[in-house]
Amino acid sequence: MGSEILVGIGEFRVAKGAVLKTIGLGSCVGIALYDPKLRLGGLAHVMLPQSGNGTKRSAKYADHAVEMMTEAMERLGSDRKRIVAKMAGGAQIFKHMTMDMLRIGDRNAEAIRTILRDYGIRIVSEDLGGDEGRTVYFFTNDGRMLVKYSRGGELWI
């Protein structure tokens, strides 16, 4: 296992031979991209489904995060055709809020699915929804993702 790199809210990181970690995924979604040939991976902590017109480019938005992470991986020699994705998060932390506008977790997940499809990137596994926060560890040496739940328990995806 390589060094651990923390990915903050609204940030992304790309690395080889490291463990990328993001904490506090409630309605936010952690998107991991992986190139198995290069053993190169990236992780973003996305807060919102899409940016508005004229919004500064930031990984806190799903549309920008996928674009920025893909570009960073391609600069390091990755081919988009080889990249696969994993996602975790998108919880409905406040179950009593049912208005669609407040269902940020669902909206984040759907936006990411659409963007990845547009980029031709296949989602190979996901752990989305529910009502529990998550911490994600993404192992760039082999593409595995460990999801730890805020109330205990874990899942490898």
UniProtKB/Swiss-Prot annotation:
**EC nos:** 3.5.1.44
Name recorded for this polypeptide: Probable chemoreceptor glutamine deamidase CheD
Under the heading InterPro entries, the entry gives: CheD-like_sf, Chemorcpt_Glu_NH3ase_CheD, Cytotoxic_necrot_fac-like_cat
State the reactions this protein catalyses.
Answer: L-glutaminyl-[protein] + H2O = L-glutamyl-[protein] + NH4(+)
Q: Which GO terms describe its biological process?
A: chemotaxis
| Keyword check for Hydrolase | yes
**Entry superkingdom:** Archaea
What keywords tag this UniProt record? Chemotaxis, Hydrolase
Q: One matching Pfam family, short form?
A: CheD
Q: What does this protein do?
A: Probably deamidates glutamine residues to glutamate on methyl-accepting chemotaxis receptors (MCPs), playing an important role in chemotaxis.
Q: Which family does it belong to?
A: Belongs to the CheD family.
MF (Gene Ontology): protein-glutamine glutaminase activity
